[in-house]
């Protein structure tokens, strides 16, 4: 996902209740404003109901992207509780759940790979749990036992006054294992498309990530930069410094792959973040150009249109 000219785009939220005219209008608006890239979250809950797949709502979006020449980052988002799980789960709940996730990926990738506008698959929305220990499900226990068998005994915290970071190291490994599992399935189904992730809360979740391992199965690396969520250690005057810092961290850890700002706060937030913030046009432009000056191939705003439901409803829109 390398570009000769930095790209600017936005997340398009596709939701039940939108008409084909609504969706066409979103992509026409992108085209008319020089935005040639967009991101779509592929809600499994919108496509799989009553044991049947119905892709028609998202087909409208992909056809509109084809029509207006907009390239798409498609974020895999298996079925979850949409009302209470805004960002998506980080790990499967069980072996059976992993099989359901695989079935979702197989169905979605196999169907949407037909569209010319599809550019890259975002393997998981905002991986990283910020140090939260892995819940030992049947799947996690199986992976943990295999991993622990190869874990150097001298690094285990069994001695006197020796810090034990076994669980933290397993979190990093398990995150890599799960992302690689998704990447292998996606590559097998659609080898011509890119594979991408967008780490978030970078200053707090950085130990969760093993970027050298990711470089073996990703084609680009991104980040989520939201002033209302991720900039707690900065004053508002220092927000551009935060954008620069986090961009530098991701660019360095992309290890030669292209890096993007996959999500940048583009609109007002009063209730669905840690810090209410209503950026002006001048602020937004400063954050945009700071990211591009840091070497980003492109910036995708969160988001073009406001969501109609859940915690983010009525907020974030450009």
What are the roles of these predicted feature ranges?
Residues 6-18, 41-56, 85-102, 111, ...:
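The substrate-binding groove and active-site-proximal loops of carbohydrate-active enzymes
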Residues 23-109, 173-194, 287:
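Aromatic-lined substrate-binding rim segments of carbohydrate-active enzymes
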Residues 196-198, 204-318:
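Hydrophobic targeting/anchoring helices
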Residues 6-12, 36-40, 72-76, 119-123, ...:
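Hydrophobic faces of well-ordered beta-strands that scaffold small-molecule active sites
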Residues 32, 51-52, 75, 79-99, ...:
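Aromatic- and acidic-residue-enriched carbohydrate-binding clefts of CAZyme catalytic domains
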Residues 92, 111-245, 249:
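Polysaccharide-binding and catalytic clefts of secreted carbohydrate-active enzymes
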Residues 16-32, 100-109, 201-214, 279-290:
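Short, acidic/polar
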Residues 2-3, 26-34, 59-69, 108-116, ...:
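Acidic (Asp/Glu)-rich catalytic clusters
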